[in-house]
Amino acid sequence: MTGRGKGGKGLGKGGAKRHRKVLGDNIQGITKPAIRRLARRGGVKRISGLIYEETRGVLKVFLENVIRDAVTYTEHTKRKTVTAMDVVYALKIQGRTLYGFGG
C-alpha cells in the first residue's frame, strides 16, 4: 500500500462522470399515498389536501438535520461511509432514541 490511506483499493482516479443523473426535486418522491399510509398508521381518518406539501416540508427539514448530524459523526471518525450507528447517535442527540440497530 503506497500512500493510498486507509481502505482505498486505488482503482481508477474517480474523474468526471460523463452521465451524471440530474437530481431534481426528490421530495416529490414521497407520494400522496405514502403520506396517507403514514397518517393511517397514526390513526388519522380524513386528510386535508394541504397536508401533503406541509408533510413533505417537515420531513425534509427533519431528514436534513439527522443527515447533517450523522455526517458530522462520520467525518469525525475519518470515514467516508455513514453507518447505521451514525444515524442512531444523530437521532439520540436530537432526543429521539432509536433501538434495534446496534449499540
Curated annotation (Swiss-Prot):
Residues 17-21 bind DNA. Keywords: Acetylation, Chromosome, DNA-binding, Methylation, Nucleosome core, Nucleus. Its main location: nucleus. GO terms for molecular function: DNA binding; protein heterodimerization activity; structural constituent of chromatin. InterPro entries: Histone-fold, Histone_H4, Histone_H4_CS, TAF_TATA-bd_Histone-like_dom. It is found in: Nucleus; Chromosome. Coiled coil: none annotated. The modification N6-acetyl-N6-methyllysine is found at residues 6, 13. Residues 1-20 are annotated as: Disordered. Residues 1-14 have a biased composition (Gly residues). One of its GO terms (cellular component) is nucleosome. PROSITE patterns: HISTONE_H4. The nucleosome is a histone octamer containing two molecules each of H2A, H2B, H3 and H4 assembled in one H3-H4 heterotetramer and two H2A-H2B heterodimers. The octamer wraps approximately 147 bp of DNA. Belongs to the histone H4 family. PANTHER family: HISTONE H4. Core component of nucleosome. Nucleosomes wrap and compact DNA into chromatin, limiting DNA accessibility to the cellular machineries which require DNA as a template. Histones thereby play a central role in transcription regulation, DNA repair, DNA replication and chromosomal stability. DNA accessibility is regulated via a complex set of post-translational modifications of histones, also called histone code, and nucleosome remodeling. This is Histone H4.
